[in-house]
């Protein structure tokens, strides 16, 4: 089993963790038909995608 020779400093730990932060929330788009805000590449809550009704709710 691997065991480190010496303890990592707070600085090195922070540098390693600097890439772990979550990015901004998903991008949003506005539907052309209803003007409703929705996640990109997803249908709106009322069933429209790219201006067409894709599912009956």
UniProtKB/Swiss-Prot annotation:
Keywords for this protein: Ribonucleoprotein, Ribosomal protein
Bias-annotated ranges (Basic residues): 1-16
Region (Disordered): 1-45
Name listed for the protein in its UniProt record: Large ribosomal subunit protein bL32
NCBIfam families, A to Z: rpmF_bact
Highest classification ranks of the organism: Bacteria, Pseudomonadati, Pseudomonadota, Gammaproteobacteria, Alteromonadales
A biological-process GO annotation: translation
HAMAP family associated with the record: Ribosomal_bL32
Any one cellular-component term (Gene Ontology): large ribosomal subunit
Protein family according to the UniProt entry: Belongs to the bacterial ribosomal protein bL32 family.
Family matches, as Pfam families: Ribosomal_L32p
GO molecular function: structural constituent of ribosome
Top-level lineage group: Bacteria
Protein's organism: Psychromonas ingrahamii (strain DSM 17664 / CCUG 51855 / 37)
């Amino acid at each position: 089993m691997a065991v480190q020779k010496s303890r990592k400093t707070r600085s090195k730990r922070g540098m390693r963790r600097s890439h772990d932060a979550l990015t901004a929330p998903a991008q949003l788009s506005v539907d052309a038909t209803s003007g409703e805000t929705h996640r990109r590449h997803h249908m709106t809550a009322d069933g429209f995608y790219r201006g067409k009704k894709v599912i009956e709710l």
